[in-house]
């Protein structure tokens, strides 16, 4: 009986020792990889900011209010037409499904 408990205790301590040693090493790797990740992230955000400002400047140079108004008008007319025809289609479909009642 005593040998079994001693064997179990040794195995538990061995597993705990491996866990402690295993947990210690990845933290160092994690610290270096997180700093690398942070550097990459900062670099990406820097490039993103430059690209965003360039595109925004280009958009402001080429912005045409008359074209914008025409696009909005076409969108409003087309959505009104689509909603009208969708209503007609729905009514026809319901009348076909119900039949002559």
Swiss-Prot record:
Q: Where is this region: Lipoprotein lipase cofactor?
A: 78-101
> In the record, what lineage is assigned to the organism producing the protein?
Eukaryota, Metazoa, Chordata, Craniata, Vertebrata
Q: What does this protein do?
A: Component of chylomicrons, very low-density lipoproteins (VLDL), low-density lipoproteins (LDL), and high-density lipoproteins (HDL) in plasma. Plays an important role in lipoprotein metabolism as an activator of lipoprotein lipase. Both proapolipoprotein C-II and apolipoprotein C-II can activate lipoprotein lipase.
The protein's superkingdom reads: Eukaryota
Q: Which residues form the propeptide?
A: 23-28
Listed under GO cellular component are: chylomicron; high-density lipoprotein particle; low-density lipoprotein particle; very-low-density lipoprotein particle
Family classification? Belongs to the apolipoprotein C2 family.
Q: How is it modified after translation?
A: Proapolipoprotein C-II is synthesized as a sialic acid containing glycoprotein which is subsequently desialylated prior to its proteolytic processing.
Q: Subcellular location, in the record's words?
A: Secreted
Provide the GO biological process annotations. lipid catabolic process; lipid transport; positive regulation of phospholipid catabolic process
- Region Lipid binding: start and end of each range? 66-74
User: What GO molecular-function term can you cite, just one?
Assistant: phospholipase activator activity
> What InterPro entries does its record include?
Apo-CII, ApoC-II_dom_sf
* PANTHER family named in the record: APOLIPOPROTEIN C-II
**Name listed for the protein in its UniProt record:** Apolipoprotein C-II
What span is annotated as the signal peptide, if there is one? 1-22
Q: Which UniProt keywords apply?
A: Chylomicron, Glycoprotein, HDL, LDL, Lipid degradation, Lipid metabolism, Lipid transport, Secreted, Sialic acid, Signal, Transport, VLDL
Query: Looking at the Swiss-Prot or TrEMBL record, what is one Pfam family this protein matches?
Result: Apo-CII
């Amino acid at each position: 009986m005593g040998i079994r408990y001693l064997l179990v205790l040794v195995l538990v301590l061995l597993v705990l020792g491996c866990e402690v040693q295993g947990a210690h090493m990845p933290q160092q790797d994690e610290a270096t990889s997180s700093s690398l990740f942070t550097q990459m992230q900062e670099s990406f955000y820097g490039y993103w900011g430059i690209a965003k400002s360039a595109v925004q400047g280009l958009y402001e140079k080429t912005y045409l209010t008359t074209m914008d108004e025409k696009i909005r008008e076409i969108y409003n007319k087309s959505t009104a037409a689509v909603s009208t025809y969708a209503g007609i289609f729905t009514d026809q479909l319901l009348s076909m499904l119900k039949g002559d009642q």
